[in-house]
Amino acid sequence: TDHAKKLEIEILEDEAKGITKTEKYFQVELKSGSCLEAKTVIYAAGASHRRLMIPGSKKLEGNGISYCVSCDGAFYQGKDAAVIGGGNTALDDALLLSEICRKVFLIHRRESFRGAYGTLKLLEKKKNVEIIRSTEVKKLEKRGREIQLFLDSGRELTVHGIFAAIGMQPRTEILKGLVNLDKNGYIQTEEEGLTSAEGFYGAGDVRAGKLRQVITAAADGAAAATAAARYILEHYQ
């Protein structure tokens, strides 16, 4: 932010609610009601965690349900926790929690996991980890400082915290019909972030098929900015 201010780049605290392409420019409609006209657009809105859609989960958000083990895992040292999910994040979360929690339940709705086989084998050897397959959580109830999980098998579990790792949702709803998206809603891009709409670039977690880390997002931004600047020089001089 400081770097942008030094370069006298205007920073708007607003939200884009729609983007359209005219013959020569992009029209960016803002939530405040104003509209911006741009020669190019770099779209880097990121992705958010998919929320649990279980009866009782909404009121437990931030009060027993977390989406970040590295942020909140330490609060459950010596306590019981549940991880819901079947990908790499779920397996990694369960492995990390197994080092600090008394008991970890890893719950997956399918029989097989999508995550790394090696991590799964490590979890299977952990005495304080119970892997529950082909099972869904039907309801959650807060009871004092504990949370009751009601499983579709009829079993009930009691934990102090729940970590959800059921995937990410890219913030690309406003791009439908403007650029090509994959089946999960991520932007399909070329090497420098160029999309199917000439002059429109994607960067960071909105891009399809890439490692989702801060360092790769920063690299995406640099590549897209360079490409966008070159596009303006080539088309508007």
Residues covered by each model-derived region:
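A Rossmann-like FAD-binding core segment of flavoenzymes
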Residues: 4-30, 35-38, 99-191, 230-237
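FAD-site-proximal beta/loop scaffold in flavoenzymes
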Residues: 48, 53, 58-75, 166-213, ...
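Glycine-rich Rossmann-fold phosphate-binding loop(s) that bind the pyrophosphate
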Residues: 85-87
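Generic hydrophobic/aromatic pocket-lining and core-packing "Φ" positions
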Residues: 94-95
